[in-house]
Amino acid sequence: MSEWKKVKIGDFLTEREGRYKSDDSKISKYKRLDKIDFSGTIHISDKPTKTDMIIVHPGDLVISGINVAKGAVAVYQGDEPVCATIHYSSYTLDSSKVDLVYFKYFVKSPEFIAALQKQVKGGIKTEIKPKHLLPLEISIPDLQTQQEIVKKISLQLKKTEQLSVEIESQKNYIKQLRQNILQEAIEGKLTADWRKQNPVQKGNPDYDAEALFEQIQKERNNEKKQKELSPITDEEKTFEIPEGWKWVRLGEICKKITDGTHKTPKYTNSGIKFVSAKDIYNKELDFSHCKYISESEHKELYKRCNPELNDLLISKSGSIGTVVLNNVTFEFSLFESLALIKYTQSELVPKFMKFAVQYICNNLTISDIKGVCVKHLHLNVLSGQTLGLPPLAEQKEIVNKVETLLTKVKTLENQITEREQLTKQLMQSILKGYV
């Protein structure tokens, strides 16, 4: 049975010293270590920085001071040195005392986290520098036992990695399944059997989209004279719509398509909520971290852009094309990164509109997104998008079908998430059981 003994990490790990200004000629020829991801992969970059630098040599153990507790540790395997910001530290290791792979596993183990929490002020919330790492006391077995442990861990982790690959494949399948459901709904395939039982009734908006469209136009023109959009070409009709449906442009069935203020308001500590694309989380509006503006400024902004219950909000920048159905009754204001779509809710079912606009956004092409450095979805592009408009009764049936299917998909998704969490726990338990 091997004997475990307490040692300081500094007994076998030595910091590679040297600190350089970012414009120092000694490092000008080197590429830069951009980041170490949580899987331990090193990413190299040519991006400049003004932060002070260190030099990392081939074979060095490199640790991210900010993310070491999340697994950002790696051995640099390049052929020539690179530089890294001082948020990283580089070490040589005495291989007669500690196996390098064993120590990498140890740094990713619960025991290492526990040592940080116990021996370093601030624990894992502190940026871990050599002065924190090297004095840490840990327990390790003899070198031969370390190498035996590495073999066992590697074998077990290989199995969990295979599980992770399977889970990632299942997650991609779920994503594709959601898109397929949406596509079949918006193309009328989900409600093919329903239409057999509910044939077209000319002049009835519930069962005739042409009549529904005429009704929508009356409502829109009663409120404001609407700008005419160009006729829809055959090339824009991307699928064959069912009998009783009608090809329309989004701008033809909406009362308003606008966006939030383009001028940054004066923020306050409280008042009226002011949201941007950053406040969309999991395809829902999340007000928990939003900004606030005064009531007087809100009233001025609300005259042009007035989100109300069941209006649609669409992210115009960042994660472009995420669609949210507003489910709150209180007033709030928008920044320019969010578009607002208002429509007549008596003629268009809110959840159907969300599905339809999300389908449109999913199929936007690169040419639809404007901008060189910062990409944006322009309102005129959104307004000109085409969709097949179903009669009112069929819109309701589409919503029922989609929600039933998405509930089943959500159940599958929860099962995959549970498997993913169990796999992560398994990886941690493997490390805990050996190191």
Where are these regions (language model features)?
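Basic, amphipathic alpha-helical recognition segments used for DNA target recognition
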Residues: K5-Y20, P58, G78, S89-I140, ...
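Short coil/turn segments at secondary-structure boundaries
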Residues: S22-K31, K118-V120, A192-N198, Q226-D234, ...
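Cys/His-rich finger/ribbon microdomains and the adjacent scaffold used
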Residues: N204-R249
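Short amphipathic coiled-coil heptad-repeat segments
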Residues: M1-E3, L157-V200, K218-N221, K225, ...
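Short, Lys/Arg- and Gly-enriched loop/turn segments at beta-strand edges
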Residues: A69-Y76, I320-N327
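Low-complexity, Lys/Gly-biased intrinsically disordered segments
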Residues: W4-D52, G65, K70, I232-T233, ...
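Non-catalytic DNA-recognition/assembly elements of restriction-modification systems
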Residues: M1-Y20, P135, S139, L143-Q147, ...
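A generic structural signal for residues embedded in beta-strands
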Residues: I63-S64, I314-S315
